[in-house]
C-alpha cells in the first residue's frame, strides 16, 4: 500500500502541479520516504532540506497528525498507507 505526500501550493511547481504524490513501495522511515520523493521530484529537496540533509526550520512535516519534530525527525517510522503532509510555516503581522 503506497504512502501519500500532500504537497503545499508553493512546491507544486516542482511536482508538475500535483497536490499529492504517491510513493510505492512504502518506505519504513521518513528519510526513506523523502528520498523517494526527491528521486521523483528533485526540485523539492532544496526547499525542504538543508545542505546537511535536515528538515528546514520553517518546514513542518506531519505523518498523519503527528509533527515529526516530536516523533523522531527523519528516523520517524512510516507505515504503509500513511499520509505525510509538508507544511511551510506561515507568519505575518501588521
Task: Report the location of each language-model feature.
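Ubiquitin-like/PB1-type beta-grasp interaction modules and other compact soluble beta-rich domains
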Residues: 1-94
Amino acid at each position: 500500500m503506497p504512502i501519500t505526500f500532500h504537497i503545499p501550493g508553493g512546491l507544486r511547481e516542482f511536482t508538475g502541479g500535483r497536490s499529492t504524490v504517491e510513493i510505492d513501495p512504502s518506505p519504513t522511515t521518513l528519510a526513506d520516504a523523502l528520498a523517494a520523493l526527491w528521486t521523483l521530484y528533485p526540485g523539492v529537496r532544496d526547499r525542504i532540506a538543508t545542505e546537511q540533509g535536515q528538515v528546514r526550520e520553517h518546514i513542518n512535516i506531519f505523518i498523519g497528525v503527528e509533527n515529526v519534530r516530536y516523533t523522531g525527525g527523519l528516523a520517524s517510522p512510516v507505515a504503509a498507507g500513511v499520509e505525510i503532509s509538508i507544511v511551510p510555516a506561515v507568519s505575518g503581522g501588521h
